[in-house]
Amino acid sequence: PLAELLDEMAIARRVAAEPVAPPEPVAITSITLASTADPTGLAAVQRHFADRVLANALPPEIPEDLITGRLPIYHHAYRARLAEVLADTYGKTCLYMGSDTFDAHARAYAVDQPPHTRSLNRYGEGLVDALRQQYPDNPELHELAQLDWDLRTRFDGADVPVLDLDSAQASGDWTTRTDMLHPSALLRTVTTNVVSLWNAIHTDDEVPEAVLLPAPAALLVWRKGFQPHFRTLDATEAALVRHLHIGLSVHDACTALLEQGLWAGDAAALSQWLAQLLGEGLVRAKHPPAATA
């Protein structure tokens, strides 16, 4: 936000304006290297600095102390930058909660859950559970956050060639292949009208009231090329996709559905499901033969 940026710039200007006495020249006649270095020295300094940055209250400022004199910059920037990362990952959730409310939760999360890797690619996974604990009576909120997270992380799935409808019709064995579902495919169970909420926020329409569904529904999330997608499935199609998701072939999945009494053998319905999976880029092409020495 502009106000925070102006505050941060003001702190930086104040620090830059502080007079710094030039160092007195020192004549170096010899250097003696210690035989052993303190292995905990750097780690202790880093831990001490991190504790101050993560503390809710800043320590008293000592003008001649270079660390405490500049600590407000890091104390503010740490929370602000990670809150921006979370607001980007959970874009629809941020808009649903309101930017100020979300920012407060994001800053608290940044203190409770500091990053442990150099990349922030998957930072914030635990925010879904944090919102679930803080808002137990708002299941649509955590389901919306979960959908935001799932859509963003579909890009972590491997890039594999996909089978289109024309190629499938020319192939005689694709329905008997195992592990044929695209690796980015993910199935979730939702209990609210989270799909309507997400779509309304995305198109900037009036957001409907959050309601519970008559029965839990299956939500399929995947990536087609460079675009993440999601859609709900009816009960039978969801059962089919679950079998495919664990590695069964289409043939074996259909056999399992028949044995479980979940499908009556309707060929027209099966053809429609498979055509949709092919059209949505959810069927991976045949694995290339392994290279031989």
Which positions does each model-derived feature cover?
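Long, charge-rich, low-complexity alpha-helical segments
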Residues: 1-171, 226, 231-293
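Acyltransferase donor/substrate-recognition loop-hinge adjacent to the catalytic core
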Residues: 175-181
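Short secondary-structure capping micro-motifs at structural edges
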Residues: 171-175, 206-209
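Low-complexity, glycine/alanine/valine/leucine- and proline-rich hydrophobic stretches
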Residues: 183-246
